[in-house]
A protein has these predicted regions:
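Intrinsic disorder/low-complexity detector
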Residues: 25-26, 32
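A composition-driven surface/loop motif
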Residues: 12-15, 31-297
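Hydrophobic core
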Residues: 17-25
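Bacterial Sec-dependent N-terminal signal peptides
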Residues: 1-15
């Protein structure tokens, strides 16, 4: 009910295929041609104008990132589990690489950009799959509902995202989950790889995992601003709705947004000014509508 009510209150753009004039794009020259074989990855990043100076690198395989965290479930009982916590509390550049699969099991990962912080985050082949869920609350009818532990990426400040190498972030395979939660500002910048957001497993057929939310622009029960998402460059594939934003803007790059429900993006303001945007619906539906609406679209 809360999800349905929220959706009705939002503006949206629905399933369609929309191409806008590309204002800015990533250079098409191969970096393998520009650099001699064997050059360091950092040099390639610098060629892309990625902000790598004084960058802090987090390898998800690093045991120092793992810690025990306790949650309180709907029954008032403690639930303790091992998680990977990356808390970004200072302005700077951060590189995320590796996988959160440790000894054959996935360790749920939480990357948080604190309020008031501006961070450049470079995903360098990161593969993050969050699976855990717990009984987190009770609805007005007394029914217990489950939720994910946290989103993969939690943006309360400002996050500029770059993708050096194809990276995939996933949320648990459940009806109400989201990969990125942004109550600040998120901008996808240039890169040399694709960022994929989805529910479930990156190794599975993404066409079956396009329900739920890929990006959520609000936090329930908290009186705070809604987030903004801007696509300036790069390559984004998001399987699941982008919901609850104050503003969604696209000026460049490439984005493939797929959602099995009626609309791909819900935002108060939507501005498509450039880039290549593809919006697709559930292939099993026989109807396709073309709809772009926002308060200031």
């Amino acid at each position: 009910m809360r999800k349905k009510f929220y959706r009705q209150a939002q503006k949206g753009i629905c399933i369609a295929t929309l191409s806008a004039t590309v204002l800015t794009s990533i250079p098409t020259v191969s970096y393998a041609e520009a650099y001699a074989k064997g050059r360091a990855v950092m040099e390639e990043m610098q060629k892309l104008s990625l902000p790598t100076e004084n960058a802090v690198t987090f390898n998800l395989a690093d045991a120092a990132l793992r810690q025990e965290k306790t949650f309180v479930d709907a029954y008032g009982e403690d639930f303790t589990t091992t998680v990977i916590e990356i808390n970004i509390a200072k302005n700077g550049t951060y590189i995320i690489k590796g996988s959160n699969e440790i000894n054959g099991a996935f360790v749920d990962t939480h990357i948080k950009v604190e309020k008031g912080v501006e961070a450049n985050i470079i995903f360098d082949g990161a593969q993050i799959q969050n699976n855990q869920r717990y009984a987190s609350g009770v609805d007005s009818c007394g029914n217990i509902y489950t939720n994910q532990l946290f989103p993969v990426l939690d943006i309360e400040g400002t996050a500029n995202l770059y993708v050096e190498k194809d990276s995939c972030l996933t949320s648990p395979d459940m009806d109400y989950s989201y990969v990125i939660q942004v109550t600040g500002d998120m901008t996808l910048k240039e890169g040399n790889g694709r960022l994929t957001l989805m529910r479930g497993n990156c190794k599975e057929d993404s066409e079956e995992e396009k329900y739920g939310e890929s990006i959520l622009g609000r936090k329930e029960g908290e009186n705070r601003r809604r987030g903004t998402v801007t696509l300036e460059g790069g390559d984004l594939a998001a399987y699941g709705g982008i919901e609850g934003l104050e503003k969604f803007t696209m000026t460049g790059g490439k984005a493939e947004l797929s959602y099995g429900d009626s609309r791909c993006v819900y935002a108060e303001d939507i501005a498509i000014l450039g880039g290549e945007l593809s919006l697709t619906d559930d292939a099993e539906k026989e109807w396709v509508s073309y709809f772009l609406k926002g308060r200031n679209s």
